[in-house]
């Protein structure tokens, strides 16, 4: 039997996730790169306590209070929980899930369902919130000017275009700095409020790998590749 977990001071994994978010922001200026060992979600240099069992074998105590399997992590993610997953025989762990507690509504349209699922994922939600905050803060400085709806639309579209990367083949670091694949800002006048405008921002991020379903087939002759 190993040492009792009650003898150690455990910390909330939320602080580790917050550290990943702040590290991504400090490096890229955005907070999408917070998942996976290679995607910014790694937690390194964990304290690994090693002890000797009665049979003489040296065993490392898991630095996370609970060792969560991949299957259990997927179940927790589907319920809106982000788990810290320990990599065995190392001093590292990582966050793989980006799901929030918001349950996406189900629609009859595949496009609407896809948009709802994206809106429930933390990396995209953090970036979208930052864009919304900047638009409100920036346009507040324009209050009192003589900008028309077209002027505001051109101004915001020119601004947001600097964060759009059209290439799907760019590296992860480049996509982290330019988090949008497409973007558009629509500005219209508020008929009942002269001088007031309504703004709708459409954001299409660079999608992150969520899961991969693999199948294995044993054949005597390789078939032609699927088109």
List each language-model region with its residue ranges.
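Long, charged, glycine-rich C-terminal linkers/tails
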Residues: 167-190
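Long, contiguous, structured domain-core segments that constitute the functional module of a protein
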Residues: 2-155, 211-214
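Glycine-centered secondary-structure boundary/capping sites
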Residues: 78-82, 168, 195
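C-terminal edge-of-domain segments
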Residues: 184-227
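Intrinsically disordered or highly flexible coil/loop and linker segments, enriched in small
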Residues: 144-148, 161-169, 210
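Active-site lining segments that contact anionic ligands and/or coordinate catalytic metals
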Residues: 90, 130, 156, 180-182, ...
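Generic structural hydrophobic/aromatic packing signal, biased to beta-strands
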Residues: 84, 93-95, 135, 183-187, ...
């Amino acid at each position: 039997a190993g040492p009792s977990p009650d003898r150690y001071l455990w910390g909330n994994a939320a602080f580790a996730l917050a550290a990943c978010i702040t590290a991504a922001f400090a490096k890229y200026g955005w907070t999408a790169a917070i998942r996976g060992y290679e995607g910014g979600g790694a937690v390194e240099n964990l304290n690994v306590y090693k002890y000797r069992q009665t049979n003489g074998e040296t065993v490392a105590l898991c630095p996370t209070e609970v060792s969560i399997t991949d299957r259990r992590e997927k179940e927790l993610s589907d319920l809106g929980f982000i788990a810290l997953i320990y990599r065995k025989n190392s001093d590292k762990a990582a966050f793989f899930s980006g799901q929030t507690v918001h349950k996406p509504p189900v629609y009859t349209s595949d496009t609407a369902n896809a948009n709802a699922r994206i809106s429930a994922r933390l990396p995209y939600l953090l970036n979208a919130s930052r864009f919304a905050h900047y638009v409100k803060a920036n346009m507040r400085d324009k209050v009192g000017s003589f900008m028309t709806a077209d002027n505001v639309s051109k101004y915001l579209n020119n601004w947001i275009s600097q964060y759009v990367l059209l290439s799907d083949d760019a590296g992860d670091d480049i996509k982290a700095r330019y988090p949008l694949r497409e973007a558009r800002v629509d500005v219209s006048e508020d008929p009942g409020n002269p001088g007031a405008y309504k703004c709708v921002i459409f954001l299409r991020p660079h999608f992150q790998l969520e899961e991969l379903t693999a199948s294995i087939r044993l054949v005597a002759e390789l078939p032609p590749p699927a088109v």
